[in-house]
């Protein structure tokens, strides 16, 4: 179990603690990317909204890769 905390900022500027970086990254990859790039779609989680831009996706990918 990974005890490291990961946070992202929602579209309206609120800080969101990612409960499980593995599931979060997998969902973004499966549903909000095309050819490994953020596709500018909208991801909603627990009332927080995130536009999955290239920068947003890469920042989450960096967090995911840092857990190793």
Give the location of each predicted region.
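Acidic, low-complexity, intrinsically disordered interaction modules
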Residues: 9-61
């Amino acid at each position: 179990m990974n005890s490291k905390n990961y946070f992202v900022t929602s579209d309206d500027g609120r800080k969101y603690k990612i409960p499980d970086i593995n599931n979060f990254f997998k969902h973004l990859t499966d549903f909000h990317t095309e050819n490994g790039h953020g596709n500018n779609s909208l991801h909603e989680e627990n009332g927080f909204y995130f536009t999955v831009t290239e920068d947003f996706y890469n920042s989450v990918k960096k967090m995911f890769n840092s857990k190793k």
